[in-house]
């Protein structure tokens, strides 16, 4: 559920800006003898996403290509020459499909992954479609009363299953209902006791802002977690 790729694009841009700072520091005060031909190590090929909407998939790929082109121009200013770059040679790994039904291991082997992040859809049990109910049940079938959970909880369970035996770190923006009331016992107890999930950081409830005309007031939290070892926790 990567949508139009906002999270992926912003993450890519942030990492490339950091990389450009490193390149600039390495070149600072030096006389460049010959051309620096391949200084870039961060590429859009290192970013993966799953999205059910075919149009959003196209938008996400395009956004990443544009971001890559923009950052390439910034790097060229630092190395003072044109780099060999054709955007369409780069491959943005955005896959069209249902993120709760797909095998994430087939999209990217978990041993090659470091971070999972996103803003999965929030849909309360009273507003879910039949298809969404089936999605959630397929992921949470071993969790009693899972039908009462918000649709977004499926991503926590799916991620926790995928992350077993790794040091992957994950974080999701979610409706704050997952940390209140009945949802706490239904969702978090099996995640803690059976999947050995550890919360690494949490961002307190905030109101989701949107430019939509008829936007609803949605109260959100951000929860970061791992199923591997964790050194610190932050609130």
Regions found by a protein language model. Give the residues of each.
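Surface-exposed acidic, glycine/proline-enriched linker/cap segments
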Residues: 24-42
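Conserved SAM-binding motif I beta-strand of class I
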Residues: 47-50
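Post-Walker A helix-loop "phosphate-sensing" segment adjacent to the P-loop in P-loop NTPases
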Residues: 17-22
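Conserved SAM-binding strand-loop segment of SAM-dependent methyltransferases
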Residues: 92-97
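Conserved SAM-binding loop
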Residues: 60
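Conserved SAM/SAH-binding beta-strand->alpha-helix loop
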Residues: 53
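Signature of N6-adenine DNA methyltransferases within the class I
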Residues: 9, 16, 57, 65, ...
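Class I SAM-dependent methyltransferase "Motif I" SAM/SAH-binding loop
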Residues: 1-5
